Amino acid sequence: MLDLLKRFGRPYAWRLIIGPATKLVEVVFDLLTPLVVARMIDEGVASRRPDVVVRYGLVLAGMAVAGILIVLICQKCASVTAQGMGTDMRRELYRRVNRLSFAQLDRFGTASLSTRIINDVNQVQLAVALAIRQLIRWPFLAVGSLIAAVVIDWRMGLIFAVCLPLVGAVFALVMAKSVPLFKTVQAKLDRVAQVVREGLGGARVVRAFVRERNERARLVEASDAHARVATAVGRLSAVLNPATFLVMNLGVCAILWSGAVRVDAGGLTQGQVVAFVNYMTQALLSIVYVANLVVVFTKASASAARIAEVLDCEPERQADAVCPSQAAHDTEPGSLQIPGASARPVPALDLASVSFTYAGAQAPALSNISFSLPAGATLGVIGGTGSGKTTLLELMAGLYEPACGEVHLFGNPVDAWDEADLRRAVAVVPQRSVLFAGTIRSNLCWRDPAAPDEALWGALDTAQAAEFVRALPKGLDAPVAAGGTNFSGGQRQRLAIARALVGSPRLLMLDDSYSALDVRTEAALRQALAHGAPAPLTQVVVSQRVSAVRNAQAIAVLDHGRLVGLGTHNELAATCEVYREICTSQQVSVPPVLSHAACREVAE
């Protein structure tokens, strides 16, 4: 918590000083008020002197007006500081999240990151605001009230000596049991957010499979688990106020009884008894508020630790790394070579014994993948579900780092590239075409915000999207709903491909990006990418369709994370058992088997 305050509180340093300082002045007024009231009772009311009552009343009114002005200053400082620090924290968190690697994002989880950015920052904001407004006020008011009461009459001050330890014991007991539960509450809240996110994100799938009841059951289970822990914490916290007020009221009763005896004996005045009761009430109420502050700060401390966990997580890829000079990179001896790769000294892609395992997985997603791809060539990647196609693409794009082996891009290790240069050189179109709320123009300009209209229309023409965009009333300025829900699946895919082409990337990676296109549009798109895109454009096309990859210069066949075939369509159809099975399942004609050696043996 203190580290976050040091990190984000510097721009608001003077407000962090002025706010609590004004509260100290307010505490002085609060401590003087019972004394003024006591003088009013003893000198004015008891003596029946209205002028004295009016004089002290004006003093109290002046103190009240001054207190209001002081409170306004403090509230202003607290609001600006808390909101400003919260905004800065969210901005820094979001910036850091966008720099994390995909593996780090997987470890945190989307739901957890959302909760940290929204809920945890809110908890810290609340703690900062209360720290400015209350952290100085209540402890000083409690101590000041105790001192003032002892000064009035030390014998009655012994009542404080009994009441304060009782309140402290209740406070310590409740905190000891509730503090460990706060982190559990946050973890349960993460689970609720995850279930809600999955249910809303997959609403169409849920309805298609009539799984509404199951999803409701999942949400109820997660909500109940959160509610049980939150209720337990709430019950413990709820004990504080009643227990404290019980002790306080018993103390007031003791003061009134003892004060009456002392007044009869002439040891105290009526005004002093009233002042003593006020100080007793202020002191014990201050302890109640301090207890509530501790609850808030404990929650905020847990939230601050979760925020710091993200902020202190160094990205696995160094964004400020210097890309080394262009140099030829030799592939591993014996690695499979795409035809034509040896003709170029610096291939566009070079994988050497690459393996990868997802965190928590028992088996590797990819094992010992090696090949080279010349610049300007097209590589098709095909395989069954779960064979590792998308994982291979993400490794080649630098989105994940291999567990072992090396990935070189245009002659340089992927992890040595500057992050911005890498993203300019490589464009990835993921399986799920994601469009953002705005316009078609704003979505297309993600890679190049200054791209002229000619470049945008050129990308749309290549992606076979220009025709339907021109038909829209506003053309490039046509609105796009969140997620692109006002476009069909095929239109979203074509717009996503057009967005990737803007900025002239050197390497285009398509992850099953033809799946929503009809055969004619797919063929036209492949033709345009092969001949109409800026040259030289290297392509990696991941697909489950043979038609999408059969014209590629080379096709990589994956099976259970292993490279079991590499070659042209005709070569694989004649030699690779897995590829032949895929072709047969899609009713693609294949030539007679020329070799009985399966591609699994080739890879081994």
Annotate each predicted stretch with a short phrase.
Residues 11, 15-28, 130-185, 257-268:
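Transmembrane helices of ABC transporter permease
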Residues 1-33, 37, 45-60, 74-78, ...:
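Membrane-integrated ABC transporters
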Residues 21-22, 26-42, 63-110, 114, ...:
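Juxtamembrane helix-loop junctions of ABC transporter transmembrane domains
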